[in-house]
Amino acid sequence: YISVNSKPEDLSASKTVARKFINKFLQKNKDFQVEEIDLYKEHIPRLEYQYFEKRNCIVNEDDAKKLNDKDQKEVQRIRALCDQFISANVYVISAPMWSLSFPAPLKEYIDCIMQDQKTIKFEGKKIEPLLNDKPRTMVYIQSSGGNVPWMLRPILNKGLNYVEDIIKFMGIKKFEELLVDDTGFTEEEKQEAINKAYEKIDDIIDSMKF
């Protein structure tokens, strides 16, 4: 579970819906364990040129030893984030819509997990996905203050579209969106949006295959 919101859970519509989703998912899939990462609390490295030996490929362990201590720790952290992502079967991201996109920490996280020979591979001039090795599902839970008409979503919902594209680019074929739209300005409006999102949870969970 990847949360991308600095608000406490009880103040965040996206995190509130995500928690409900996770709890219901675990009720129906008792063999699963949840790992949680809060991108506002965890350290997500900002990628520097010296961390790479080639495009989208982190330096190998021998070359990493030539870096200073700080850079070595950053490379180790990038590897750990990528390996953690690869190990999962189901991914849940909760994020608000900000400026037609999402908060910046999510992009920094995605940059860390887009790694050659890990989540993608280069075959000549072609890029091949590597996360199509088993059934995987991404559930993207997004809150927004207004209600974006479905006809305008390709234009206005750029963050959601980007996440879906990049996830499928890595080979995760099943992408589900759970939108908490029209949270408005009052607590009543927010709760109504949350309740509407709750109604969609069971159908999404029941559609998953492992």
PLM ranges: what are they?
Residues 26-29, 132-135, 168-170:
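A short, structured loop/turn motif at beta-sheet edges
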Residues 70-161:
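Helix-loop-strand module that forms the ligand-binding subsite of alpha/beta enzymes
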Residues 40-42, 144, 181-183:
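Short, solvent-exposed coil/turn elements at secondary-structure transition points
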Residues 1-95, 100-108, 199-210:
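N-terminal beta1-alpha1-beta2 submodule of the flavodoxin-like/Rossmannoid cofactor-binding fold
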Residues 4-6, 143, 180:
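Cofactor-binding loop segments of dinucleotide-utilizing enzymes, especially the Rossmann-like FAD-
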Residues 6-10, 147, 184-185:
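Short histidine/acidic/glycine/proline-rich micro-motifs that form metal-
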Residues 31-33, 136-137, 174:
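Residues at the starts of beta-strands that form the adenosine-phosphate
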Residues 150-210:
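Glycine-rich phosphate/pyrophosphate-binding loop and the adjoining helix
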